[in-house]
Amino acid sequence: MVRVCRFVDYCSFSLQGEKMKKIAISFSGGRSSAVMTLLVLQKYPDADIQITFANTGFEHEDTLRFVDACDRNLFGGRVVWIEAVINQEPGIGVGFKVVNYETAARDGEPYIAGVRKYGLWNKTNSSCTARLKVEPMQKYLKTKGFVRGKHLNHWTAIGIRADEIDRLSVNRLRDKVVYPLVEAGVNKREVLRQCAKWDFDLRIDEHYGNCVGCFKKSTRKLATIARDTPEYFEKWRMIEEELKDFKKQNNYDPATNFRRIYRKYMTVDDLVQIGSESGFRGFSSAEKDSQGYMFDDFDFETGCGESCEIY
């Protein structure tokens, strides 16, 4: 197990005498999140722990397989799969429904429903995480007695690693957010070493994580996906074409009179073009970790996999 002793020392702490009796875990479907979840479950077998996974319909199929495999092999079937329910009527908030590995959306249904109500999501209209993950999971947790706001009664465990401390929330004490991997000193290499022991480990590189075509990913990652597996962008192209008129004030391209999903008003076809150029150097996590190339504008990213959002 990854540095269990340091983790145990950390998880024995209390804040102003308050023990961690209720813990919410948002399982992202990634390796770091899996290791963190396992550690928390092992340390707190008697705590009221709720594990949720929010599916947007645009996750890679292997992410869904990994979530299911972790649940069956490590977490004792405790993961609750949540999907947003978007009511198109004005003034009605986001709901949720509980699904499972077999019934989970795989054609972008929750995401597309959200775009039809809230407009094309992009860098200036980036509420997709809130609408498709945060709100549905919080509403589910409320049905289990996990309350937020001024009556906050639980901790939230986040799978950020020790090599990602710049992502920690500045409001972590106020919001009762804990980072077990950070406090345990667990970095990416240690997470990979742990997951390599599992015969159900993820089989995709990191740029396929979260929503495959997410606008928050770097241009290099997106162009690499467009080059290697262009079929993943067919739905994104449909969204771009059919819903480009929604809320023009957000990421509005004055040259075309339409909104765009990607940075610098790029379209799906622009990403395909970049990936097809002879001099394009595709993304590789191994090369990135070894600093095999210098980072430039192609490598700038923010978002679900890079931000410090609670869920």
Question: What spans do the regions from the language model cover?
Answer:
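Nucleotide-activated chemistry modules centered on ATP-dependent adenylation/adenylyltransferase
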Residues: R3-Y311
